[in-house]
Design a protein with these regions (language model features):
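Low-complexity, Gly/Ser/Thr/Pro-rich intrinsically disordered linker/tail segments
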Residues: 144-190
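Repeated polar recognition positions within modular binding domains
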Residues: 56, 60-66, 76-78, 112-115, ...
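A short, highly charged nucleic-acid-interacting micro-segment common to nuclease
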Residues: 71-85
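Intrinsically disordered, low-complexity N-terminal segments that are enriched in acidic
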Residues: 1-3, 190
C-alpha cells in the first residue's frame, strides 16, 4: 500500500460504458468463483480463494496497472499491490457470505523494514483470523520454490503469530474515520 487510506470500493472509470463493462466482468468473475466453490466447507472456500488470488494476481512492483489499489486492477488486469489483493479477497468473501473485513496498518517485512500494508480478517467457526494474501504470494518472496510453510505463512493466523509482523491502525477511509476491527483469535486456526 502507498500509505494513503481509501474507501472499500473505489474505482476510477473514464466513461459510463467502461464502468459498466468492468463491473460486469468483475461480477462474472465473482459468480464463477462462487459456482466453482459450491458445496465446499468455508475453510476450503477460504483456502481456494487465497490460492486463486495468488495464482492470478502478480504484485505490481512498478505500479504498471491502471488500478493497482483496486479490485478491478487485481481481478481484470491481474496486477495489484497489497490493497488490491485485500480488497479482492473481501469482494469474493462477500459473494461467498463469509464474514470478512479489510484491515490497514503496518507490516514489518523480512528485512525488518516497516511499511504501510493491507490484509484481511475472516471469520471461521465463530472466531476471527488474519489472512495476508499479498505476503503469501511467492512473487513477493523472490519467486523460488515455495513450501506450504511459506505459501500459508499468513493464512488463518491468530494474534500470537500474526501481530509479530502486522499492526492494524484502525483507519480505513479518506476522512480518517476510525474503525474497531474484530478481535482475532489468540491462536492460529487448527
Amino acid at each position: 500500500s502507498n500509505g494513503s487510506n481509501s474507501s472499500y470500493l473505489k474505482e476510477k472509470f473514464k466513461t459510463k460504458s467502461e464502468m459498466t463493462a468492468k463491473l460486469d466482468l468483475l461480477e462474472a468473475i465473482r459468480k464463477e468463483i462462487d459456482r466453482q466453490l459450491e458445496g465446499l466447507t468455508d475453510y476450503d472456500k477460504i483456502k481456494e480463494v487465497h490460492n486463486w488470488l495468488i495464482d492470478n494476481i502478480e504484485y505490481d512492483v512498478n505500479l504498471e496497472a491502471d488500478e493497482p489499489y483496486s479490485i478491478s486492477g487485481a481481478l481484470t488486469e491481474g496486477k495489484a499491490v497489497c490493497e488490491g489483493y485485500a480488497r479482492s479477497f473481501k469482494y469474493i468473501m462477500d459473494e461467498l457470505q463469509i464474514p470478512c473485513v479489510l484491515v490497514s496498518g503496518t507490516g514489518t517485512n523480512s528485512n525488518g523494514e516497516t511499511e504501510s500494508h493491507a490484509w484481511n480478517y475472516v471469520q471461521l467457526d465463530g472466531k476471527w483470523y488474519a489472512i495476508d494474501v499479498t505476503w503469501d504470494d511467492p512473487i513477493i518472496l523472490g519467486n523460488g520454490y515455495v513450501t506450504d510453510d511459506t505459501y500459508y505463512k499468513h493464512f488463518l493466523k491468530g494474534q500470537n503469530t500474526f501481530f509479530e509482523t502486522h499492526q492494524p491502525d484502525g483507519y480505513l477511509s479518506q476522512n480518517s474515520m476510525e474503525f474497531t476491527f474484530p478481535t482475532i483469535s489468540e491462536e492460529d486456526y487448527e
